[in-house]
Regions:
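Catalytic core of membrane glycerolipid acyltransferases/transacylases, capturing the structured
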Residues: 17, 21-42, 53-54, 68-126
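Transmembrane alpha-helices and immediately adjacent membrane-cytoplasm interface residues
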Residues: 48-58
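Membrane-interfacial terminal anchoring regions of lipid-handling membrane enzymes
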Residues: 1-29, 38-41, 58, 64-67, ...
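Non-catalytic C-terminal accessory region of glycerolipid acyltransferases
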Residues: 130-244
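Generic preference for hydrophobic
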Residues: 60, 74, 97, 148, ...
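Residue-level "edge-of-site" marker
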Residues: 64, 126, 188
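Short, basic, glycine/proline-bearing loop/turn elements
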Residues: 47, 118-122, 153
């Protein structure tokens, strides 16, 4: 039933939303930053509605660590498709997610994602991946935060909620080259909403923790060299706290 309701809602949202995006495209060009923020707020509202319809209760901690006027690199473990929804609603500034390139084939979704700074990466194409990393660096320099899941794919280990696959170090070039801070994010419970019951949606509780910002300039050379492993350890600690 929830899947049907979400499907109906998305149909209405995308239908009405295309008119809204058209208006923003027409009138928002005089102040593109303000227009982008309005569109991001529209997406956040849509995500909150989907979570409500899906019966998802999000328990968030550390939201005081989310900056309002500073572009950062968010780094999180990846459990399910709902990871995007339960984190995006707490990002205070425009935040673009790095997504799999296959999502680019979904017409309406692609338009929305591009409007809020999302980028599409083909992890099988090294040259294209590097291009996306460079674009991410420029976006951060222009005030748009970037959200990545460095595991590269959803973790399917259901026996250990604190398990995290190896982080791909290349993703962290965004922080290394732009000088932005890194916000570690821990997520628990999203797989139980959808992936564990495909194709059905089950309501439930999701836990999201935003850790204290990591400034690479304050780390020693060894920690900077292995920043992916350092962030992974920080997120693991947050996941352990969620299980306590």
């Amino acid at each position: 039933m929830r899947l049907i309701l979400v499907g109906l809602y998305l149909f209405l949202y995308f239908t009405v939303g295309m008119f809204y995006l058209g208006a923003e495209w027409l009138f928002g060009r005089w102040n593109q930053k303000a227009s982008m923020l309005r569109q991001y707020r529209f997406v956040q509202w849509g995500f909150r509605c989907i979570l409500f319809i899906s019966g998802v209760k999000v328990h968030a901690k550390g939201t005081e660590n989310v900056p309002e006027d500073e572009a950062v690199l968010y780094v999180a473990n990846h459990r399910g498709i709902f990871d995007v929804l339960v984190t995006a609603i707490y990002c205070k500034g425009v935040t673009g997610y790095i997504s799999k390139i296959v999502i680019k084939k979904v017409p309406c979704l692609r338009v929305y994602m591009k409007r809020i700074g999302c980028l599409f990466m083909d992890r099988e194409d090294i040259k294209q991946s590097l291009k996306i990393i460079l674009e991410s660096i420029e976006q951060v320099k222009n005030g748009i935060s970037i959200f990545i899941f460095p595991e590269g794919t959803r973790n399917k280990n259901r026996e250990d909620a604190t398990d995290i696959a190896t982080f791909k170090e290349g993703s962290f070039k965004v922080a290394q080259k732009s000088g932005c801070r890194i916000i570690p994010v821990a997520i628990t419970g999203t797989a139980e909403i959808f992936e564990d019951h495909l194709p059905w949606i089950h309501g439930g509780h999701v836990y999201v923790t935003f850790g204290e910002p990591i400034d690479m300039k304050t780390l020693d050379k060894e920690e900077q060299k292995h920043i992916g492993e350092y962030c992974k350890d920080r997120i693991h600690d947050l996941l352990v706290e969620q299980q306590a």
